[in-house]
Amino acid sequence: SRRERQHLRLSSPEAPVIVDGRRLLYDATHSSSNGEASCASCHVFGHTDQLAWDLGNPDAGVTRLPSSIKFNLAALGSNVNGTGNVGELHPLKGPMLTQTLRGLAYHGPMHWRGDRAVGVSGTDPATEPPFDASLSFMNFIAAFEELLGRAEPLPTADMRAFTDFSLAIAAPPNPIRALDNSLTPAQARGRRFFLGCDGLDTRSGAPVD
C-alpha cells in the first residue's frame, strides 16, 4: 500500500535536553525559510565546516561592544573590528572561519569579535569572568532570520532548548595525549608557554586568562 501501517515510539536513553535541542541544529524545515539550510550546514556535527564565510550586512550600522576586553590582542595586533577601535563592531566584518560549537559552556562573548555579547536576549558586559555563555548563545536567535532566512523569529523556548543542548556539547579528548596524562618534554614546554603567555599579556594592558 506504500503507506505507514504502524508507528511505534521506542525509548531513548538520551536526556531530554539532547532530544529537544538537537532538532534545532539539524532540522532545516523548522529553522530556515525553505528547508535548505540548518545550523548544521556550517556547524557540521556541532563542529565546523572549515570554511570562511563573508556574512557582513551592508544595511546594518556600527554597534558598540560593552566589553572592555582588548580583542586586538587575540588577533596579535590586527584590527578585527574594522575601524581600529576595538569597542566598535562594523557590520562588514569580512570572511571569518566557522567556529565550533564544542566546549562553548566555558566561553562568554561569542563570535570572532565577541559581538554576541549584545543582542535581543540581553547584554553581557563581560568585564571579568565568569562570562555569561548562555546569554551570548541566546543572542544567536537573530541568525535564524538574518542568515537562514526564517520568515519569523524563532520561539524563545526553542532557542532556550538549542542553547541548553549546544552548551552541553563537549570538546573531544586530545587523541595523542598519553593515557596517564603525562606530557612529553615538548608538550610541557608548550603548556608553560601557553599558560604563561610569555609576556603577551602586557601588550595591550589586558590580562589573558
Language-model region placement:
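Periplasmic c-type cytochrome electron-transfer domains
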Residues: 1-209
